[in-house]
Design a protein with these regions (language model features):
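N-terminal secretory signal peptides that target proteins for export/translocation
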Residues: 1-5
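Small/flexible residues
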Residues: 8-9, 23, 87
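Exported/periplasmic cell-wall-interacting domains
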Residues: 40-42, 77, 81, 93-181
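Hydrophobic core
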Residues: 16-26
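Basic side chains
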Residues: 6-7, 89, 126
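Sec-dependent N-terminal signal peptides
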Residues: 6-18
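Cell wall/extracellular polymer interaction/catalysis modules
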Residues: 26-97, 105, 111-115, 120
């Protein structure tokens, strides 16, 4: 009986440890590739975004290429998590609000220098020259030096322009984008 209880406790502890490991963001040196779907190009490149840390890490053949703080979706318009692939690239790209004037989500027309689309519905990884703050807390109400009070993006992933130029020229159509909570 004692051995049975001991085995049961050990299995429970192992299950808890596995659940905790699966829920955590990957360490900077680890890359988790999608096993079910390989892109046709960009196979050795992956962009990993941590929403909780508001950070982006781009890897080339397992080596860190570039990292940067980002701004992601506000609580009521969150950035979706999951595995995606870049399927369109634009330079420049003009964003026009799909929401009418007067909507709490309306925004004035803006142009990004570099934009890469990764999900239907207008989800892009792009620079945001109008934004002055990137990093932890950028996806909740905060004081932005260029925008004033800001709640985060409308679901896109924003980066500083200089960094986005490098990512844009490095990434190819098909590059994997992994977005973690």
């Amino acid at each position: 009986m004692f051995n049975t209880m001991r085995k049961f406790c050990l299995l429970g502890m192992l299950a808890l440890l596995l659940a905790l490991l699966l829920a955590a963001d990957p360490p900077l040196s680890a890359i988790s590739y999608a096993s079910s779907s390989k892109p046709s190009t960009g196979q050795n490149k992956i962009i990993v975004v941590s929403i909780s840390q508001e950070e982006l890490y781009a890897y080339d053949n397992g080596q860190l290429f570039i990292s940067t703080p980002v701004a992601t979706g506000r609580p009521d318009l969150p950035t979706p998590t999951g595995i995606y692939h870049i399927f369109n690239k634009y330079s420049p790209y003009t964003f026009i609000s799909p929401w009418p004037v007067g909507s709490p989500y309306y925004y004035a027309t803006v142009t990004a220098n570099y934009a890469m689309e990764w999900a239907q519905g207008g989800y892009f990884l792009h620079d945001a020259p109008w934004r002055g703050y990137f990093g932890k807390g950028a996806n909740n109400w905060h004081k932005d030096p260029l925008m004033g009070e800001d709640p985060g993006t409308h679901g896109c992933i924003n980066t500083p322009t200089a960094v986005m130029a490098q990512i844009y020229h490095w990434a190819t159509i098909g590059t994997t984008l992994q977005i973690n909570a």
